[in-house]
Regions:
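Short, surface-exposed ligand- or partner-binding patches at beta-edge/loop junctions that are enriched
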Residues: 80
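Rhodanese-like catalytic fold shared by cysteine-dependent sulfurtransferases
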Residues: 1-24, 33-36, 44-76, 85-120
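Conserved histidine-centered catalytic loops in small-molecule metabolism enzymes
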Residues: 27
Length: 120
């Protein structure tokens, strides 16, 4: 029984890691209100093959060295990766740099595609 409790606690803490997870619809709403700064964490080639409108590409491996490019700290910073598994780690990096309003696209770009939402 203690192992089950540990697993549950791990899953709960991991689900909140890096920032609050949001739906595609919430991302669209925040973006339409001009209240979001979208960061696509995928590699440049994947970004060029299709990304969410108004997102900028800062690959995860470069994020720690490029936080100075995040100029609009008054907006929600929404992190986007392939499946939503890299974004929590990126959120932790941003929180250590002093960013407070970090959000994560639940399911990443794959979930976005599954909902037939547009990419540019």
């Amino acid at each position: 029984m203690p192992l089950v409790i540990l697993i549950i606690l791990f899953l709960i803490s991991n689900s909140k890691k890096g920032g609050k997870k949001i739906s595609s619809q919430t991302l669209i709403s925040l973006s339409n209100q001009d209240n979001a700064f979208l960061i696509d964490l995928r590699e440049s080639e994947a970004f060029q093959n299709g990304h969410i409108t108004n997102s900028i590409n800062i690959p995860f491996n470069n994020l720690a060295n490029r936080t100075n490019e995040i100029t609009q700290q008054d907006k929600s910073i929404i992190l986007i990766c392939d499946m939503g598994s890299v974004s929590p780690n990126a959120g932790e990096i941003l929180k250590k740099e002093g960013f407070t309003n970090v959000l994560i696209l639940k399911g990443g770009i794959n979930e976005w595609r599954m909902q037939n939402l547009p990419l540019v």
